[in-house]
Amino acid sequence: MFGLDQFEPQVNSRNAGQGERNFNETGLSMNTHFKAPAFHTGGPPGPVDPAMSALGEPPILGMNMEPYGFHARGHSELHAGGLQAQPVHGFFGGQQPHHGHPGSHHPHQHHPHFGGNFGGPDPGASCLHGGRLLGYGGAAGGLGSQPPFAEGYEHMAESQGPESFGPQRPGNLPDFHSSGASSHAVPAPCLPLDQSPNRAASFHGLPSSSGSDSHSLEPRRVTNQGAVDSLEYNYPGEAPSGHFDMFSPSDSEGQLPHYAAGRQVPGGAFPGASAMPRAAGMVGLSKMHAQPPQQQPQQQQQPQQQQQQHGVFFERFSGARKMPVGLEPSVGSRHPLMQPPQQAPPPPQQQPPQQPPQQQPPPPPGLLVRQNSCPPALPRPQQGEAGTPSGGLQDGGPMLPSQHAQFEYPIHRLENRSMHPYSEPVFSMQHPPPQQAPNQRLQHFDAPPYMNVAKRPRFDFPGSAGVDRCASWNGSMHNGALDNHLSPSAYPGLPGEFTPPVPDSFPSGPPLQHPAPDHQSLQQQQQQQQQQQQQQQQQQQQQQQQQQQQRQNAALMIKQMASRNQQQRLRQPNLAQLGHPGDVGQGGLVHGGPVGGLAQPNFEREGGSTGAGRLGTFEQQAPHLAQESAWFSGPHPPPGDLLPRRMGGSGLPADCGPHDPSLAPPPPPGGSGVLFRGPLQEPMRMPGEGHVPALPSPGLQFGGSLGGLGQLQSPGAGVGLPSAASERRPPPPDFATSALGGQPGFPFGAAGRQSTPHSGPGVNSPPSAGGGGGSSGGGGGGGAYPPQPDFQPSQRTSASKLGALSLGSFNKPSSKDNLFGQSCLAALSTACQNMIASLGAPNLNVTFNKKNPPEGKRKLSQNETDGAAVAGNPGSDYFPGGTAPGAPGPGGPSGTSSSGSKASGPPNPPAQGDGTSLSPNYTLESTSGNDGKPVSGGGGRGRGRRKRDSGHVSPGTFFDKYSAAPDSGGAPGVSPGQQQASGAAVGGSSAGETRGAPTPHEKALTSPSWGKGAELLLGDQPDLIGSLDGGAKSDSSSPNVGEFASDEVSTSYANEDEVSSSSDNPQALVKASRSPLVTGSPKLPPRGVGAGEHGPKAPPPALGLGIMSNSTSTPDSYGGGGGPGHPGTPGLEQVRTPTSSSGAPPPDEIHPLEILQAQIQLQRQQFSISEDQPLGLKGGKKGECAVGASGAQNGDSELGSCCSEAVKSAMSTIDLDSLMAEHSAAWYMPADKALVDSADDDKTLAPWEKAKPQNPNSKEAHDLPANKASASQPGSHLQCLSVHCTDDVGDAKARASVPTWRSLHSDISNRFGTFVAALT
């Protein structure tokens, strides 16, 4: 937006990336404001990704995940810097800003935040620097008075506002600015999301930043960029994802510089407390003091940033700010506390007084509020987030914006923070990411260690009223319920690590929900409390730390809101169920927070669309919701963040989350820390099984929340998320058990996936992408992947949402999955419709993806979202989510094993590539036996592919694909496709692109990517595909797989397309296969495993089914000698042969990857099929299967899917298990690919085959992997997988099972991801 433009220079100054990101964000952000920012991960990350890329590929994941294992540091850090800064500016202009971005960014963020940040510029700009810049540039200058700002700002810069603002926010600020300093620059991105965590930190006073997270980061931040702290704790895992992207560059570059400058300031910031004098000195600032605390810090930050970009920023923002001032008033209205107005002209008056007060924690309530503990919160309310959502929002819903800001920010911040802590925004979101910000934020409050305490203020969240929210939410909502509820467990880990924040986040999540209702009262309370809170806030800051967690919860809640909102849109009932259980919903949101962070941005975007719906669901939050839609986007970015964060953060921690236990770090979060995962799982569970659905909102959003999760996760897919959530939401009922059970799977999927992705922290990049996906799906897969599971569940939805924000098509996918039970046909129809819708919307996704390309990670997230979306459908969707995660796994690993993800894509491209292929796919798919489905898959896929090409398009397509694949029997194909597509698109595109190759990454994201894929293998593949397609629906799938495998190997981006294509065909294949699968499922797996998997092994297994088809196809593809394998399966055989051609033909090197990809796809397909079978049978099962698929793909996810399916059916289990083993092996193979070539692959395959046939024997599977060169690791994974699969199988339906699976998945995922990373 204007801010953006303005910001851009600044950004440029700060960082080209930032600018890019910024404007991306602006565009995105501005667009959806949150969509992008929130979606940042998705959108900006794309653009930003470049910068982010540098920072962390998965901006989505907060690529910065990588710093944290995945997200947190990267994310949070980045986020902290970027996000935090963003959050800062987005958050509440000053608080967060200075907190995160002591410097320019901050300031502008701040100002906008405070000033009008939210009002107009911030809304759009808030997230965007543009807005923020505006806001805060103006805020600084325009804020109360530009001169003060300028001068103060300058002062700040000179004085190092941090100090200045240090005094302002003596306690908070210092921390805060420390954080702020660190974060300051980053604000540029869309703080909104991140603002949350950052906000929290900022808000909280950066202590948060400063605090544990902050502190850890602090050094890091200081070290890192200074922003790190903020970033980190911004943990924009989610938001960062989005803004984080923005900020990433900022952080990375701009921010770093700013950081450098800002950081210095921040250094001063903490030290800056001394700078207090500055504050005084900055009387002008002082005027901004209230602001200044934010503003000053901002100023200082801004100055720093602005120092660098001061002119631009300032002038830019000056004008903007001025506007913001106007906005500010609006904000002021909105948040009297906000003190934006205060900042605005009033501030001048207040300022001096305020200044002293500012310096004193108890400045005038308004000021203080804003400034002090609460101020952070206050600012937060006033933060652009509120505005960010939109000036109107701000205006119209001062409260809302405030609330939303609060929610969002808290979410973001929390999420970021938490996520960050969890490292997985998911972030983990479950992220991308994402945001466990909700949790983070909330959690952060709780997490003292999270010195997010300072951030807590960010909990402005609670105080729509402004600070009150801080107090209210923080105190009332968060602290009490959230904090206590989840915090406890979360906090335990929290203090120690970011991870703990993860738990915090999650734990907070559920409580957040409580607060949700509180929200409204809260608002009132907030106002009352605002003052109270100001005082309280300081207290609360600690509390706020807790609250931050709570805030995260709030964020989650918000995310969930966002998710729910979307779900609500789609599935109001579920939404409500999801939503309000708010609590749970919040949990979901929380989950969503993380995921929402990512998703939330989307959500916000979506929220914008869905805002109203969201509102409905979240009545109280509604204010936020409706208006916060944008905010949601923000928060959802938190979900996205969650995803990203979750994906990223969660991916790590969240990833760890489920297997928090698995992951030591997450373990603390473990229960809670699973933040996403755990929280998903735990918070999900923690909130109570009852909440589980809601909490499972993470689950819900996860499974039952598949949709929810999807939504959450769809942060990146954010859009899809809501849809998915909605769609999934419906499944929740279906999924109710399934959701619960499946959902758990989902949580697993999300968590597990995240975990897997998490496991891919190493695969961070990939994990970012893969992890993101992995976060949700890939967790380990990549930053994106972690979220993918998160997303994945809603990926489709998410994708859809992304693509078709409101498309609903995605919803359909979810619905489809919901239909899952219905006939395949129904699913197919739905899938078809979905696909179509996706087709329509995919462009959106595409755009995002395009943006995301750089943001591949984000894209992954989105892909994940797709996966999520796919996963959204419990079975199919979820599974696709699972698949996607698997892809992410491969994707993440693909990062490690780019080919895995990538291959996915390419194969699709061929199918898709042939424009007709799509049709053919359709036809094939139809032919496949699932005409409806295949068509859906095909059509969807085609669309999806395109989408995938875009990268985010993938979500739509992915979604479609996933939708179709997961949804329908085709879904399985799609699933594989999705997995591959997701993996490829997400993994391939995102991961492939991100992981596979930056270039491919982008390429993958872009059409070129799939074009490339096609070009790679696709060129050939299309024929294959055509043949395969023509040959058989199964073939279609297989060929795609093969193609995709081939392509994947060939190229990262290629796989994207291929994946799509693959998805299409596989969908059909699976579709067709699905029926057979059901019938011949048992056979399929064996054959798939034996013959399919081991192309050479031949069709003996004769799992001619789609699964086998896929398997065969995959094996064929990768086995090269697939011919023999697919003979077993007619369709498969055909596919296989072509695949074989593709696969075998591809270089051995590619071969392994290709195989992997093929396998993954195959597995996905199989899963899909298994799922499908169950899908028809049980949505839940499918969902779980989907998770399993994801897991399997991740190595774990698939297994999980298998398990779920297994429970459902031994065949499924076997298939899944085998697949998983296969997957693992394949995966590893790709990793091994280098290590092991085609021969190894074959060899591995053979063992696989054995394992697959013996899939029942976990050992066998295990052994099989062991056989692999990489087998050992895969074996482990497999083993775990298998075991878990068994577990899951036994308990697949049960949530416990899911958790187990999730843990397993996480563990495996982690391991797997790690392994992959290692291999890679």
Curated annotation (Swiss-Prot):
Comp. bias intervals (Basic residues): 98-113
Disease involvement: CEBALID syndrome: An autosomal dominant developmental disorder characterized by global developmental delay, intellectual disability with severe expressive language delay, craniofacial dysmorphism, and structural brain abnormalities. Most patients have an atypical form of rhombencephalosynapsis, a distinctive brain malformation characterized by partial or complete loss of the cerebellar vermis with fusion of the cerebellar hemispheres. A chromosomal aberration involving MN1 may be a cause of acute myeloid leukemia (AML). Translocation t(12;22)(p13;q11) with ETV6.
One Gene Ontology biological process: regulation of DNA-templated transcription
Keywords: Acetylation, Activator, Chromosomal rearrangement, Developmental protein, Disease variant, Intellectual disability, Nucleus, Phosphoprotein, Transcription, Transcription regulation, Tumor suppressor
Function: Transcriptional activator which specifically regulates expression of TBX22 in the posterior region of the developing palate. Required during later stages of palate development for growth and medial fusion of the palatal shelves. Promotes maturation and normal function of calvarial osteoblasts, including expression of the osteoclastogenic cytokine TNFSF11/RANKL. Necessary for normal development of the membranous bones of the skull. May play a role in tumor suppression.
Tissue-by-tissue expression: Widely expressed in fetal and adult tissues. Highest expression is observed in fetal brain and skeletal muscle, and adult skeletal muscle.
Record's protein name: Transcriptional activator MN1
Matching InterPro entries: MN1 (IPR037644)
N-acetylmethionine: residues carrying this PTM: M1
PANTHER family: PROTEIN MN1, TRANSCRIPTIONAL ACTIVATOR MN1
Residue spans of biased composition, Low complexity class: 202-214, 291-309, 523-550, 564-578, 759-768, 798-809, 895-905, 973-984
Biased composition annotated in UniProt, kind: Pro residues: 338-366, 498-514
GO CC annotation terms, alphabetical: nucleus
Residue numbers bearing the Phosphoserine modification: S950, S954, S1007, S1081
Organism: Homo sapiens (Human)
Oligomer status and interactors: Interacts with PBX1, PKNOX1, ZBTB24, E2F7, RING1.
Locations listed in the record: Nucleus
Region listing for Disordered, in residue ranges: 1-26, 92-121, 147-219, 231-411, 423-442, 474-615, 629-819, 840-1150, 1247-1273
Biased composition, class Polar residues, residue ranges: 914-930, 1048-1066
Biased composition (Gly residues): 582-596, 701-710, 769-784, 1118-1128
